Amino acid sequence: MPSRERVEAFLKEVVEGSHVTAIADFYHDDATMQENLGVPRRGKEMLMAREQSVLDQLQKMHTHPVQTFLVDGDNVAIRWTFDKTDKDGVVQRLEEVALQQWRGDRIAKEQFFYDTATAWGVVGPDGTVQR
């Protein structure tokens, strides 16, 4: 079971932009990640490689400070907001909820939930998402 401080350390690392390092530091070797009801990706090395591959396609990934997260025993829920800037400078936003199952002080399973119809909406100059 993770302590609240351990979860906060994970959140801090992601918000600071250290996405791949966060996987290295906070996930079990046999961890899984799953997008909605898609096929889970398995294994820390694969998760790190996939994350790096996604980041390499972007100019920038900005993680908004987390306003809401819950810790209940081995279960953690996080409301994430991400802005990605592509190579052409277009900014898009994703809001999602991540449900994690921790084993000890590391993440064993993570599943992301978001609306695929509105995911990655373009962020206008005024900061609002255009759908």
Question: At which residue positions do the language-model features occur?
Answer:
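Short, low-complexity N-terminal intrinsically disordered segments enriched in polar/charged residues
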Residues: 1-25, 29, 127-131
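A solvent-exposed, acidic/Ser-Thr-rich amphipathic alpha-helical stretch
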Residues: 5, 20-72
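Low-complexity, intrinsically disordered terminal/linker segments enriched in charged
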Residues: 111-131
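Short, cysteine-centered beta-strand-loop-beta hairpins and adjacent loop/turn segments enriched
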Residues: 56-60, 84-93
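A short hydrophobic beta-strand element
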Residues: 72-82
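Hydrophobic/aromatic beta-strand elements that line small-molecule binding cavities or substrate pockets
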Residues: 51, 64-70, 83, 95-101, ...
